[in-house]
Amino acid sequence: MSTVKHLLQWLILGSKGGETRTKILTTLKEKPMNANNLSKKISMDYKTITHHLKILEQNQLINSVGNKYGQIYVISTQLEDEYDLFKKMIGGND
């Protein structure tokens, strides 16, 4: 089983914050953005978003460019390569 699959099972399917992290990843797949714009886009508290962004970045599912408030987040190449697997895991058909 691939490392990405293990990470996704743990971070998306096997943890309390999986639904929030799924929303973050699918939104970032559409368009890279900063935490503030992301919190507005998915209607969630900024601190909640930054908490989940930190977890996703620590696990190399997203990357960031810049620093502090203007820091832009994008899905990682690692996740991009396995995005079809991610969609299957969350029940998507795209």
Residue ranges and their predicted role:
Residues 3, 8-9, 72-94:
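Conserved segment of winged-helix/HTH DNA-binding domains
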Residues 60:
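Glycine-centered, phosphate/nucleic-acid-interacting loop/turn motifs that mediate DNA/RNA or nucleotide
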Residues 17-19, 30-34:
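Short capping segments at the starts of secondary-structure elements
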Residues 37-41:
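A short acidic, leucine-rich amphipathic alpha-helix
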Residues 66-72:
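Short, Lys/Arg-rich nucleic-acid/phosphate-binding segment
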Residues 1-23:
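Short alpha-helical segments that sit at the start of domains
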